[in-house]
Amino acid sequence: MDYKDTINLPKTSFKMKANLKEKEPQILQKWEDINIAYYLRNIRIGGTKFVLHDGPPYANGDIHMGTALNKVLKDIVLKYKTLRGYDAPYVPGWDTHGLPIEHNVTTKLGEKANALSKLEIRKLCEDYAMKYVDIQRESFKRLGVIGFWDKPYLTLKPEYEAKVLEILRSIVESGNIYRGTKPIYWCTECQTALAEAEVEYHDHTSDSIYVKFPLVGENNTYVIIWTTTPWTLPANVAIAVHPNFDYAKVEIGNEYWIMAKELVDKTLKEAGIDDYKIIDTFKGLTLEGEKARHPFVDRESLLVLADYVTLDEGTGCVHTAPGHGMEDYITGTKYNLQVISPVDSQGYFTDEAGKYKGMKIWEANKEIIKDLKENGFLVQSGKITHSYPHCWRCKNPVIFRATPQWFIDLEKNNYREKVLEEIKKVNWIPKWGENRISSMVRERPDWVISRQRAWGIPIPAIKCENCGETILDTKIIDHVIEIIEKEGSNAWFEKEAKELLPNDYRCPKCGGSEFKKEEDILDVWIDSGSSFEAVANSREELKKFPVDLYLEGSDQHRGWFQSSIFLSVAKHGIAPYESVLTHGFIKDEEGKKMSKSLGNVVNPKDIINKYGADILRLWVASADYRMDIKISYNILEQQVETYRKLRNTIRFLLGNINDFDPDEDSVAYEEMLEIDQWALMKLHNLIKNVTKAYDNYEFYKVHYLINNFCTIDMSSTYLDIIKDRIYVEGKKSKLRRSAQTVLYETAIALNKMISPILPFTAEEVYEHLNYSNKYETIFAELWPEYKENYLSEELEEKWNKIFALREDVLKALEEKRKEKFLGNSLDAKIILNLKDDTLKQILSQYDNNWIADLFIVSQFEFGNVDEGFEGRYATIKVTKAEGEKCERCWKVDPNTDNDPDFPGVCPRCARVLKEEINA
């Protein structure tokens, strides 16, 4: 007789094969159809607000793994918060001004760029930025990121630009903006000033030279300096020594050289000199005020004191050019030294450089070294490879160059100290972020905020044609804000100065009325750093200040986190964020940085096309992102395997609750079998721990906990044990409904817990779940709450012991399988001789059939075992079960085939079949 149709086999249309790359676009279309961001907002509006403010990616090129990682992390946070009942809207944004965009546009134009006006360049830059906003928007949506994609914030929008100028106005009003000539980073290729955050460090090979400066008033005596920038020697006006270091006068032939005593041997070895004698030593302090003669310019160099002089390299006598170095400039201010910077915006020497006029500075190195050698002032020359600042956009080496710029004064009004105090109040994740940003803020120079480019927000400064005064005041800014709010920042470049000024505006210095507008633009970090005001504190959906969270890469300690807190303190006196979370950078499998030249770049689109976005998101969740994160196709394959196990677990749950109506069929906790209560305990422990991990932004723990639960607690333990009960017991029996209640609750809760990480899979599962009052999307549901009364330590300890014994039994069965003694475990009978008294007491509460089900064998008994498998908790004898195999449940039973109504089945199955007929 065929009993196949009497078995409660799993039924579900939830497929084993995910086919994510085909399924995900369908779900995206559904989200589009229901307008999901607005749908969720309408449901959550009125709830506690949670604002994660989006740090704007740069609208330059398509997304890469770094931007994908960042957006997915943000999306995980916001989906979780939405499920927790928060009103957690996501307003994405883009940084759309600045040098990288302008550089790409002008590079593509080539020579044609020189013939275009600033307005024409700006129009091309806007088109370029908007093109990549659209491209990136589609890429982010494809990752499953939910947000107000139809109305993002863009730093080029007039309303945004006006807010930026409002912040600038606050800083001008406080007196913290000044115009000064001091050395700043300058890119000769891009022809603009750069802030620290716009500089990257790469290895660079430089000339390394030791030079003799004749000491005035002493025959044949020279101060020896070392430099890796020979081109800065025309600007030399001083030599710095450390007041507390010991300096030596070294006799070499008929000459006397002065340098730090500790560096004599090293310096002279490099110079190939081994015949020398130290004839005098003295403190650097004694050299202050002495003068040396410049080796090729008709002027003297003053010997000055500076604490930054080190003994790490060089001679302890530091070539000082205030026009080409910040430390040099500070020393120059102290000693009232001349600031010479004989280099133009393109890196060519000016008239001030004398015979080197018109030479490119890098090419002039060779000539300067040649002249020093011919004049007898070159001690030694060579090459050195060292870390050197490069432009973030064109990747060329930058220089320090003294030019007139606008600066934010970080000392006035205790500005820097106020920022440092606010940093202490922020929750930095990880904790080391606080020290990192604090040290950067403490050490950074005044902020150079002007740029000599076209694509950005103009600094509304004017120059008086009568007295030459450059003016930036609140009256002008207020008037320009009104214009830009209506017309956008192009207005500054379109209109004449008089059209941009208030009526009857007069020069505050001379009373003049004729003006010329300046055309410097603001540092792009002012743009993005103002977003707390222009977006978080302004957009209706957000309207929260300070916001709950900023989440970006750790490079933003020197970038957006820093610019934002400086500007927020200027405007409101407080930090713009309560918490700041940082992630590391993407590396390849071997921990190397990704680069096209190494051929190790992994593209997010390639991952999505091969595996689907959920696999990429699972990879994001798997890593402790606070450190650098490795990716490769091998690593992704591991996540594919993890996903497969999770999907199979969910499919099993869905397949076995297809006939379960939670309103009608649920079994109360108190009436459940104890193993079902254990499974609920495991589920609610999972809910508790996963919730804590999400709250702490520890998604790698979520990944681990869920994976562990599915593979160990569910698949290899509970689900294995209950298969017999749910397949074979009566369809509506309490035994089966008890297990189904667990499976149903697990499916509901597990799906919610995976949904922030695997939104596409969770939506697909949600479609297959049967319960009343379902929403259009799982993200409108509420997070599962764990029940404290389910978390019984006593129950856990008891079952830990039982499952430890079960491990022993499974090992014994596996041994017999290897010996070919057994095929299926249901062919076995287990005889146990327990070694543990507590286990004896526990198992005495259950009948032998129940224990056999636990071990997935047909028969079980306690007894003395002379020879058997020695487990940790028992000696185990595995024998063949006695009787015949039941045709329905496959268990072996001595009483199989005893019921004439149901031939070939065991007594249990005969009972079930009778009950089903009579039901």
UniProtKB/Swiss-Prot annotation:
Top-rank EC class of the record's enzyme: ligase
InterPro entries xref list: aa-tRNA-synth_I_CS, aa-tRNA-synth_Ia, Anticodon_Ile_BEm, Ile-tRNA-ligase, Ile-tRNA-ligase_type1, Ile-tRNA_ligase, M/V/L/I-tRNA-synth_anticd-bd, Rossmann-like_a/b/a_fold
PROSITE patterns the UniProt entry points to: AA_TRNA_LIGASE_I
Recorded catalytic activity of this chain's protein: tRNA(Ile) + L-isoleucine + ATP = L-isoleucyl-tRNA(Ile) + AMP + diphosphate
Residues reported to bind L-isoleucyl-5'-AMP: E552
Keyword vocabulary terms for this entry: Aminoacyl-tRNA synthetase, ATP-binding, Cytoplasm, Ligase, Metal-binding, Nucleotide-binding, Protein biosynthesis, Zinc
Single biological process term from Gene Ontology: isoleucyl-tRNA aminoacylation
Molecular-function GO terms, alphabetical: aminoacyl-tRNA deacylase activity; ATP binding; isoleucine-tRNA ligase activity; tRNA binding; zinc ion binding
Predominant place of localization: cytoplasm
Cofactor note: Binds 1 zinc ion per subunit.
Cofactor: Zn(2+)
The enzyme's E.C. designation: 6.1.1.5
Coiled-coil stretches noted in the UniProt entry, renumbered to this chain: none
Pfam families: Anticodon_1, tRNA-synt_1, zf-FPG_IleRS
Entry's localization field: Cytoplasm
Chain span(s) of sequence motif 'HIGH' region: 57-67
Binding site for Zn(2+): C886, C889, C906, C909
Motif ('KMSKS' region): 593-597
An example Gene Ontology CC term for this record: cytosol
Domain notes for this protein: IleRS has two distinct active sites: one for aminoacylation and one for editing. The misactivated valine is translocated from the active site to the editing site, which sterically excludes the correctly activated isoleucine. The single editing site contains two valyl binding pockets, one specific for each substrate (Val-AMP or Val-tRNA(Ile)).
Subunit record text: Monomer.
Protein's job: Catalyzes the attachment of isoleucine to tRNA(Ile). As IleRS can inadvertently accommodate and process structurally similar amino acids such as valine, to avoid such errors it has two additional distinct tRNA(Ile)-dependent editing activities. One activity is designated as 'pretransfer' editing and involves the hydrolysis of activated Val-AMP. The other activity is designated 'posttransfer' editing and involves deacylation of mischarged Val-tRNA(Ile).
Family: Belongs to the class-I aminoacyl-tRNA synthetase family. IleS type 1 subfamily.
NCBIfam families, per the entry: ileS
Protein name stated in the entry: Isoleucine--tRNA ligase
Lineage: Bacteria, Thermotogati, Thermotogota, Thermotogae, Petrotogales
